[in-house]
Amino acid sequence: MAIDTSLPKDIRILQAAEEVFSQHGYEKATLDEIIALADVGKGTVYKYFGNKEHLFYKLVADKNAPFLEKLRSAVDSVNSFEDKLKKYFEVMVHFYVANSTLWQIICFEMLGGNNGCRVKLDGDNFKVIPRYNSVKVSEETSERILRYHKILHDEYDILSQLITKAMQNNLLKHDTVPEITTKFVFFGVVMSIFNQSDDIAADMTDEEAARIITDHFLRGNAR
């Protein structure tokens, strides 16, 4: 991939970072390769982004913000619960297919699984806790994990609000637990996209995928 050297340096660095992170994942990606592809000096990267982790976060945060706006606009553009679900999943599927590798890095490398950590709701906030007694979570690690957790939480919280309102309006079973239901559906879709076969990716439109997801969520697989 060639980077247009007429672009501003920070844009070139972000474009190069997306290419390198997508090829190698987070841990194996190097700033040296990003610097070479962007055709900038090492000091320029540190000037704009500080370090590799801050660069990666800037890359995904800049993608996440317009994605959230599209999700909100999509669900607000229709009236019925079923149509809102379809619109939500249309936007979600399109984004996750287009950004699959970067969001796999968030899920599998940045959320603490490799460090023996997980995120738990604590009152109105989230906190990082160790999965095992021998694991010690540093403040720096905790802050990093929570940054990436917020990206995903903001995405599925829009779905959670839809499900909560539908339950309150007697459109879903009264024993529905919004948090469990939301994560079950959201991360089920996410993992399906991360692991989809090539023929499904090539043949299925965002609209068709959203229709199937919504239909299975509301009606199941029973005939």
Regions found by a protein language model. Name each.
Residues Q104-I106, H174-D175:
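Short, hydrophobic secondary-structure boundary micro-motifs
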Residues H94, D157-N169, K183-R223:
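C-terminal peripheral helix-coil segments that are non-catalytic and often amphipathic
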Residues F21, Y26, T30-L31, G41-K42, ...:
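Amphipathic alpha-helical segments enriched in hydrophobic/aromatic and basic residues
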Residues M1-H24, K28-V40, H54:
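Basic, helix-initiating cap at the start of DNA-binding domains
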Residues F56, V60, N64, L85, ...:
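Amphipathic, non-transmembrane alpha-helical scaffold segments
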Residues G116-N169, E179-K183:
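Amphipathic alpha-helical packing segments from all-alpha helical-bundle domains
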Residues K58, S73-T101, T182-V185:
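Hydrophobic alpha-helical connector segments
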